Design a protein with these regions (language model features):
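Short S/T/G/P-rich N-terminal loop/turn motif that feeds into the first structured element of a domain
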Residues: 1-48, 58-66, 77-101
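Conserved RNP beta-strands of RNA recognition motif
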Residues: 51-55
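Short arginine-rich
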Residues: 70-75
Length: 101
């Protein structure tokens, strides 16, 4: 599994309320993204927004982010991390990948 932290600066015309509303509107569309396990939509008071994604593989993540670059014509800041384990207290116990990736 791979965790990707994606960040981008919002245009000045988009405030936190508009960003949150947009995220809530588009969130259901992420249910069918190939390889995506989980996504958290994030924004900060300083005008940055993005997402924390949990992917089955880096290839799945890179394929998705290529589409973002093509659609919006910008490169967000992306950091990739190998994910050794996930504890999600809202659903299942601990999620462990089959092998370290």
């Amino acid at each position: 599994m791979i965790t990707a932290i994606v960040q981008y600066r919002l245009p000045p015309s988009i405030d936190q309320a508009a960003c949150a509303e947009h995220f809530r509107r588009i969130a259901p569309g992420f249910r069918d993204v190939p390889g995506l396990i989980r996504k958290q939509f994030i924004y900060a008071e300083d005008g940055w927004a993005g997402g924390v994604y949990l992917w089955r593989s880096r290839a799945d993540a890179e394929a998705f982010y290529y589409g973002i670059r093509k659609r919006y014509g910008m490169d967000p800041e992306i950091r990739y991390f190998h994910t050794a384990a996930v504890t999600d207290n809202s659903v299942d116990p601990v999620l462990l990948p089959a092998a370290a990736e």
